[in-house]
Structures are given as C-alpha cells and as structure tokens.
Amino acid sequence: MHIPTAAPAPAKPLPIYRQLYFQVIVAIVLGAILGHYEPLIGEKMKPLGDAFINLVKMIIAPVIFLTIVTGIASMTHLRTVGRVFAKAMAYFLFFSTLALIVGMIVAHVVQPGAGMNINPAELDQTAVHSYVEKSHDLTLVGFLMDIIPKTLVSAFVDGNILQVLFIAVLFGIALASVGEKGKPILNFLEALVAPVFKLVHILMKAAPIGAFGAIAFTIGKYGVGSLVNLAWLVGSFYLTAFLFVAVILGVVCRLCGFSVFKLARYLKAELLLVLGTSSSESALPSLMEKMERAGCSKSVVGLVVPTGYSFNLDGTNIYMTLAALFIAQATNTELTLGHQIALLLVAMLSSKGAAGVTGAGFITLAATLAVVPEVPVAGMALILGVDRFMSECRSLTNFIGNAVATVVVSRWEGALDRNRLQLALDGRESELPPPVDALPEALPAKG
C-alpha cells in the first residue's frame, strides 16, 4: 500500500501561475509590501496565517496515525520497527549534537555580541517573563510523561504529535500481531488514506493566503528596522544554518548519492510555505507524501518524519548555542570550558522538551539558560525583537534536516528506491511509476 497522490502526475508541467511555489512567492512579496507600507493593516492580517496553520494542524494527527498504523501493520517482522526507530534516533542524536557544537563554534569565531557591554540589571525583563515561565515546564521527566496521553482521544484533540505517534505505533504493532483477524481493520484504514491526503491537497490551496497573512503581520509588527541593531547576530545565524545545510548535510547527501540542493528544489513549494508561515509543521503532511513519492519506504517515512519533528531540530539547536553565547558576550559574562560543556549538555536535553510548543526556540533557550545560571536570562530581552526573524531560518533548517534524515535512514535500511529518487530530484516526476513500500523486512539489519 502506498500514499496516493491527489491526481496522476501531469504529462507536462502546469503553467507557472498555477504552481503552488509561485503562488506562495507572490503572496510573501505582497505580504511584505503591505506590512512595510501599511504596518497597522499588516498586523491585522495575523488571523489569516493563524487560520491556515490551524487548518494544517487539524489534519496532521490523522495523517500521522494512518501512515504509521498502515505501515507497521503491513510488516511481517515487527523487529523491523525497532530497527528503523533505533537507526533514526541514532541519526537524530548525532546531528542534533553536531548542530549544537556548530552554533557554539561560530559564536566563538564571529563573536556577534562582543563590544555591546550590556548591563543585565538595566534590561527590561517583563517582555521575556512569559517565556521563562513556560520554560519551567520543560523538564526531561515532564517531557517523557507527556508522551503518554491521558486518553486515546485526547492526543488527537490536542494535536500532540508525540502522543499520536505513541498511539499509532502501539496500535500498529497490536494490529500486526493479530494477523488475519486485523485484516478488515487494516483494509479500512488503508481506504481512509486516499480521502485524507485528498483533503491535504485541498487545504494546501490556501497556503498562499496563510503565507500572505503571516508575513504581513511579521513585517507590520516588528518592522525591517528592528533587524538593524542586531543584524550581525541574525546574519551569523542565517550563514551558519546555510553552511550546516550546504556543507554538513550536503556531504551526507553526497555520500548517499544525491544532492541536498536538488532535494531542496524538489521541496521548493514546501520550503516556501515554511518560510511564509514560520512553521515547519505547516508542511508536514506534504513532506510525508513527497518523500514516499521520491522512493523512501512508506514505513520509514511514517516513523522518521513525525519523530524528527520532535528529536531532529537542527536549526533550533544551532540557534540555542549561538544565542546563548551571544548573550554571554553582550553582557561580558565569562564562560569557562566547563560552563560551555554544561550549556551543551543542558541544551541537548531541553531541545527535546520543546516539541509542539509555540515559540519553541525561544522557550527552549529560556529553559537552557535557567539551568545554566552563569548566562543571565535577562539577556534574552536583547534578542526578543529579532527572534521572529530568526524563526523562519530555524523552521527551514529543521525541515530540510528532517527531509535529509528520511532519505538517509531509508538508504541505511536498504529501503530506498534510488531510481525513483533521482527521477524526482531531476524534476521528472511524470515518469515515476506508482510507489512501492520496499522495506526489506525479512533481511537482517545492515551496517
């Protein structure tokens, strides 16, 4: 069984004005113009962006549940589930840690906060107080307990990705364990996949409206001028994120036989949607569909993508250490090697506790600084004004990181159709045959 597309691939491309990525580009430009020249009107466009993100969040839980349950239930060897999950977590841990280290190295080399000579006692802490309060809930035990929903229904009502993932994995395993008795249920769930993904395609038609509203609000409320004073920090973050994707993830992609830039081109509509809404969740359903279409096993996609949205946040991790050291430099706070190692270890844990939290990057930073008292939490007031502009870059980097992870784990598992991948990345989707879930369940684990 495979995730169906809404319609067969056309023999020739649609006119550019009918393509989603072009419509989103136009919407972003128009939103930026409105926000810049009519900021009061721009701020009032916020409900458009919020409404679109809510529409997407509405469908995320069913997409994850159906994809994972049908993927696991169709397996004949359940140990495959554990093997794929273990490989995914190993990948996430390595590259998340690497992203934290990269952010720390760049902060030392570029020194974005040096020379500011800010006195933390003179900063207005009221603006960051709400974020600090939310950060108190981000403990490791609290995070682990939050994975288990109070009821089966509450996970879907709250839209908690990790809870839906937890239920889907357990239900998929249970369904596979009962054998033929579970076939009618499996067939029913497989039949539901088509209308659910058709609904995804319908909702995506509203993407330009959502992107327009979100960008108009951002520019209208914060203004491009707010970037000037902290342009060095923002520029350093964007450059670091680009180098992480182009160099580190680029090398990983090359070793796996494809180009990260071609992958980004293949996902251009989704990337523009993430840019416009500043939310990687807004493109989650489309990412799952397109990764399977590009030759990744349905079973791997169903496990890796939703899990990666909580455990593989490369952009957020780069931001955390870079921003923390920026605050230390700006406030003339000396950090020993021991302090920085402690900061790294705390950030590794706290970054996992922000899954599904609005403003996750800023809240996670508050949680990290609260545990590392050497860096003044009050210093967060310095970056509050430009955090919204760094949010887009965090989301884009997180999104690309999860797309790369899906391909890498699929290849590692021997479940990647390389011919389909190359056709998709070369823009020859019209030549693609229907996808087949090629997970080699009966084979022993590789590498």
From Swiss-Prot:
The keyword tRNA processing does not apply. Its main location: membrane. This is C4-dicarboxylate transport protein. The keyword Lyase does not apply. GO terms for cellular component: plasma membrane. It is a multi-pass membrane protein. PANTHER family: AEROBIC C4-DICARBOXYLATE TRANSPORT PROTEIN (PTHR42865:SF1), PROTON/GLUTAMATE-ASPARTATE SYMPORTER (PTHR42865). It holds the Pfam family SDF. Responsible for the transport of dicarboxylates such as succinate, fumarate, and malate across the membrane. It is found in: Cell membrane. GO terms for molecular function: fumarate transmembrane transporter activity; malate:proton symporter activity; succinate transmembrane transporter activity. Keywords: Cell membrane, Membrane, Symport, Transmembrane, Transmembrane helix, Transport. One of its GO terms (biological process) is L-aspartate transmembrane transport. The chain crosses the membrane at residues 22-42, 52-72, 90-110, 159-179, 199-219, 232-252, 325-347, 366-386. It comes from the Bacteria. It comes from Stenotrophomonas maltophilia (strain K279a). PROSITE patterns: NA_DICARBOXYL_SYMP_1 (PS00713), NA_DICARBOXYL_SYMP_2 (PS00714). Disulfide bonds: none annotated. InterPro entries: C4_dicarb_transport (IPR023954), Na-dicarboxylate_symporter (IPR001991), Na-dicarboxylate_symporter_CS (IPR018107), Na:dicarbo_symporter_sf (IPR036458). Belongs to the dicarboxylate/amino acid:cation symporter (DAACS) (TC 2.A.23) family.
